[in-house]
UniProtKB/Swiss-Prot annotation:
Binding site for Mg(2+) 1: D257, E270
Co-factor binding comment: Binds 2 magnesium or manganese ions per subunit.
Molecular-function GO terms, alphabetical: ATP binding; D-alanine-D-alanine ligase activity; metal ion binding
Official protein name in the record: D-alanine--D-alanine ligase
Residues noted as binding Mg(2+) 2 in the record, renumbered to the chain: E270, N272
GO terms of biological process kind: cell wall organization; peptidoglycan biosynthetic process; regulation of cell shape
Cofactor requirement: Mg(2+); Mn(2+)
Length: 316
């Protein structure tokens, strides 16, 4: 295994609001790769430079970063320039998927279902937004993950505080129609025609509040994998996940988040191109449901590592 992959860097930590989660993901991936015989080394991009990365002699890297500067296409572009194969999606798909506004626009262009939304700025009359989207609604920063900066707005009086919280992270704020239903997520492995959805997971958090604490630290959240769904509904959700993944040009692996409404219609919420790999994370859970261990999953993701941008032919 060591010879197959050579010297591997596990990129983790970083400088985003999700640094602590990334530290947990990276350590887990590193230990799993070592157990599989891979010559793996941790590399904290929040503490070391691109020059250090270029000099490290990695033959490929596993990106275990979440959020800005790790999941948004910037690092992927740098790795393309350095010629270092990496896991996950390329610069464009990563950038599109990290921007929740652009993600929804792409999905709508492909005829995929996603809740109605508006983009809010400093000049938006906040009191009018609930009249258009209804209440409750969701306000969130477009470029953060792990539920950072998200508020469920129950009434008109909550709009200002919710907007100000989200605006701490982004110049624009995404207001989204709230869909009542079951929270689902689907992991997808592979690229192109070979990309396949893993079993659907249902998430049931206490009080319906699946926030940062419940995602990564709470043992109170319940997960059902595979989700208790009629076979045709599960197949439909998986198919929509694969289409959503393909529409954004995703590669390698990812996770698609949904709400399933009371009529069993799936609504797309977000695309994650570098999902969590912690003890509470969902992609490893889905992999276990098909007999794939955590280490097997890490090796499978690493095996897909590649540079995605084709160099143009030289004109001499």
């Amino acid at each position: 295994m060591s010879k197959q992959f050579g010297k591997v860097g596990v990129l983790y930590g970083g400088r985003s609001a999700e640094r602590e989660v990334s530290l947990m993901s990276g350590k887990g991936v590193h230990e799993a790769l070592l157990s599989a015989g891979v010559d793996a080394h941790l590399f904290d991009t929040g503490e070391r430079s691109l020059a250090d990365l270029a000099a490290a002699g990695f033959e490929r890297v596993f990106i275990a970063l979440h959020g800005r500067y790790g999941e948004d296409g910037t690092l992927q572009g740098a790795l393309e320039l350095l010629g270092i194969p990496y896991t996950g999606s390329g610069p464009l798909a990563s950038s599109l998927s990290m921007d929740k506004i652009m993600t929804k626009r792409v999905w709508l262009q492909h005829g995929l279902p996603t809740p109605a939304f508006e983009v809010l700025g400093g000049s938006t009359e906040l009191r009018l937004v609930p009249d258009r989207l209804g209440l409750p609604l969701i306000l969130k920063p477009p470029h953060e993950g792990s539920t950072v900066g998200i508020t469920k707005v129950a009434g008109y009086s909550d709009m200002k505080a919710a907007y100000e919280l989200a605006a701490r992270f982004d110049a624009e704020v995404l207001a989204e129609q709230f869909i009542t239903g079951r929270e689902l997520t689907v992991a997808v492995l592979g690229s192109g025609a070979a990309a396949r959805a893993l079993p659907v997971i249902e998430i049931v958090a206490p009080g319906g509040n699946y926030d940062y604490e419940h995602k990564y630290f709470s043992d109170d959240t319940q997960y059902f994998c595979p989700a208790d769904l009629p076979a045709d509904v599960a197949a439909d959700v998986a198919a929509v996940a694969e289409r959503a993944y393909a529409a954004l040009g995703c590669e390698g692996w990812g996770r698609v988040d949904f709400i399933l409404d009371r009529e069993n219609r799936p609504w797309l919420l977000e695309m994650n191109t570098s999902p969590g790999m912690t003890g509470h994370s969902l992609v490893p859970m889905a992999a276990r449901a098909v007999g794939m261990s955590y280490a097997d999953l890490c090796v499978a993701i690493l095996a897909e590592a590649a540079c995605k941008v084709r160099s143009p032919a030289r004109q001499d």
